[in-house]
Amino acid sequence: MIYRIKNAVIAALILLCAQAGAASLSDIQVSNGEQQARITLSFIGEPEYAYSQDGKRTVALDIRQTGVIQGLPLQFSGNNLVKTIRAGTPKDAQSLRLLVDLTENGKTEAVKRQNGGNYTVIFTINADVPPPPPPVVAKRVESAPRPTEPARNPFKSSDDRLTGVTSSNTVTRPAARASAGAGDKVVIAIDAGHGGQDPGAIGPGGTREKNVTIAIARKLRTLLNNDPMFKGVLTRDGDYFISVMGRSDVARKQNANFLVSIHADAAPNRDATGASVWVLSNRRANSEMANWLEQHEKQSELLGGAGDVLANSQSDPYLSQAVLDLQFGHSQRVGYDVATNVLSQLDGVGSLHKRRPEHASLGVLRSPDIPSILVETGFISNHGEERLLASDRYQQQIADAIYRGLRKYFAAHPIQSAPQGGPGQTASTNQPGAITAAN
C-alpha cells in the first residue's frame, strides 16, 4: 500500500456524545505516504470544521463536536509524512481538536463531500517540494517516449549498448561480493509489506494487509525456490515490523539481484479495484543519489560492482556521481521492464487498476544497486477484492503471476556470474548501465 496515498489505514475508535442537531463523527481514516497524506473524517449530518497551520509541521483540525476520541495518539513509523495524530486543546467547550505532527514541512487543503445524509471531510496534506540536490548531482536527461510506442521503457536510452564504469584501483574487499548471488541463481528478495504493530490497510471485513502480503510472499518464495533459475528470500518471515530502510538492507545482505515488494491497495472510494505495479521515480532517484554521495562509508556496501568502484573513488565526487547515476539508471530500466512483464501476467488473474508501470517516491525502492518493483495486488478496501485477497487460491494466483513475470524477464536477460578463482572479477548484466569493476 503506497503513495496514492496510503501506507496505513486506521479506523480510530470513536466515543462521542453528539450535540442535539449537530453532526456526529463516525470514523477516522488515515492514508499516510511519503509525500502526501489524507485524513478522512466521516460524519452523520453536515459537519462544522476548520483547520489551521501555525507551523509547517503541525496541522490543527477543529470539528464542532463534544466527547472523546479514543485510540489517540496514533503513532506512525516516521518514514512517511504523518508522524503522529494526537488530541489537542479545543478552542471551546463545543469542539474537538486533532493535532497532526508531520515529519517535514507541508501544506493542507480540505474538501467536503456529501452522500445523502452522510458527509466526509478529506484533509489532504502535501509535503513541500524538497530543495534541489547538491550541485554535484547531475540531473539525468531523458527523452520522452514517442506516442507511437506506449509501452516503451522511459528509462532506456536510444541504444542498448553496454555502458560501464571501470576502476583499475586495487580493491581489498572480497570480489565475490559482486557475484550474481547464489551460484548462477537469480536471487529475488521478496518484501511482504507492513508487519508487527503496522497492520497496513484494513478491509471492511477486517482483513489486514500485513497478513495478505506475507501469505503471497511465502507462496512466491516457494515458486522461486522450485525453479533452478531462482533463489527466493524474504525480508520478513513472520509478524514483525521492519523499517523501510531496513528492508533494503536485508535484501542487500542476501546479495539480492532484484526486490519485489508486495502490498494491498486501499482508497476512500470503495469501488476502486485492480492491481498495479510501481517503480522508482526520477525525483526520488535524484534525491537518493544525493544521500548516497554524502554517505561515503556506506558506498562500499553496494552490490553489482558499484561498491568496488566507489570504495576507491571517495576523493573524486564526480566519479562517484557518475557511478551512482549509471547504477540508478540501470535499476530503473530493469525495474520498469520487470514491472511491464508482471503487469501482463496479473492481467490474466484479475483486473488492473493501472495498465502501465506507475512512478512513485517509495522508500522500499530506494536502493541504487538492487532493481525493484512494488506490486499492489488489489484493493483491500473493496469488499469483493478483500474476499479474493484473503483466499488461499487467489493469493496463489497472484504469486504465480509475479513469478511468471520475473521468469519471463530473467530468461531473456540472464544474470552473468563473476568468474571464480581470482581477485579480478567482473559483475554485470546484459542491460545498459551495468557497472563493471576490474581490479
From Swiss-Prot:
Residues 138-167, 415-439 are annotated as: Disordered. Its main location: periplasm. GO terms for biological process: cell wall organization; FtsZ-dependent cytokinesis; peptidoglycan catabolic process. It catalyses: Hydrolyzes the link between N-acetylmuramoyl residues and L-amino acid residues in certain cell-wall glycopeptides. GO terms for cellular component: outer membrane-bounded periplasmic space. Residues 188-407 form the MurNAc-LAA domain. Residues 425-439 have a biased composition (Polar residues). The lineage of its organism: Bacteria, Pseudomonadati, Pseudomonadota, Gammaproteobacteria, Enterobacterales. It is found in: Periplasm. Belongs to the N-acetylmuramoyl-L-alanine amidase 3 family. CDD domains: MurNAc-LAA. Residues 1-22 form the signal peptide. GO terms for molecular function: N-acetylmuramoyl-L-alanine amidase activity. Cell-wall hydrolase involved in septum cleavage during cell division. This is N-acetylmuramoyl-L-alanine amidase AmiB. Keywords: Cell wall biogenesis/degradation, Hydrolase, Periplasm, Signal. It is an enzyme of class 3 (hydrolase). Its EC number is 3.5.1.28. InterPro entries: MurNAc-LAA_cat (IPR002508), N-acetylmuramoyl_amidase_3 (IPR050695). The gene is amiB.
